[in-house]
Amino acid sequence: MKILIASGAGGGTAKGRIGKYFHLKEFGDALEKIDVDYKLVHEFDYITGFPSKSPKGWFSKKKFYDLINEYNPDAVFVDWQSHFALETIKAGIPLFVYLRGHLWMEVESAKKTIYKDLKMRTVLNLRLKNAERVFTNCQGIFMTADYLEDVIKEHIPNARCYHFLEGLDTTRWYPAPGMKLEHPCVGLVVDANMWHKSKEMLVLDEVIQAMPNVHFYWAGDGQYKNKILPVLEKHSNFH
């Protein structure tokens, strides 16, 4: 069996994207252990479609179909509900989709916060419509959390849902010199890629100020870090 895995979530079409590629590589390596062949690609290298930041890719599907004809997969696995998935459905290839979170809540939150203008709200609506077409016509949706099944069924009643368990491969861990922490301290391990979640870090402004003898360390990064760091870095006990 041959599985084509397309990485798109988290990276988008921005230059230098990383997305969730690393985790999908580990998934593919696990498939190889049960004698399943896989090919992992960045989906935006082959097709983008509308709406996206790459107008040149709105109408071109040649790279996508060249990939399909060359690799001839038995099934396709994607982590982004976009045009790669839609074209897979049109090509008649079994499609499986990986859903990491509450997509509908994330879209509504984005409309109320960072994408309030009409243009971006329209883009979000189009992307959500594409995603729902993918969910409706795919062979299965893999979820990272049990609660998502009820969420998905609320919007896509006939969806076929499967639980996808993620794990850590400790053989990949390696020792590294740590930083010297000043005590007492609090460690924050969280990314800054979803604004409706990331904005909660701003409540630390008053907390850090009220606890000058406690050091706060943030281990994280993301597209909204520049909205958070200017607020928190003014405190000498934030690192």
Summary of predicted features, one role per range:
Residues 47-50, 97-129:
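Acceptor-binding helix/loop patch of EC 2.4 sugar-transfer enzymes
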Residues 62, 66, 118-141:
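Membrane-proximal helix-turn-helix segments that form the acceptor-binding/catalytic region
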Residues 40-67, 115-120:
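A short, charged, and often flexible helix/loop element on the N-terminal side
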Residues 66-83, 88:
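Short N-terminal targeting/anchoring amphipathic segment
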Residues 4, 177-201, 205-209, 217:
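Conserved donor-binding/catalytic core segment of Leloir-type glycosyltransferases
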Residues 1-44, 206-209:
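N-terminal subdomain of nucleotide-sugar transferases
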Residues 147, 167:
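Carbohydrate-associated surface elements
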Residues 218, 226-239:
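Nucleotide-activated donor-binding/catalytic signature segment of Leloir-type glycosyltransferases, i.e.
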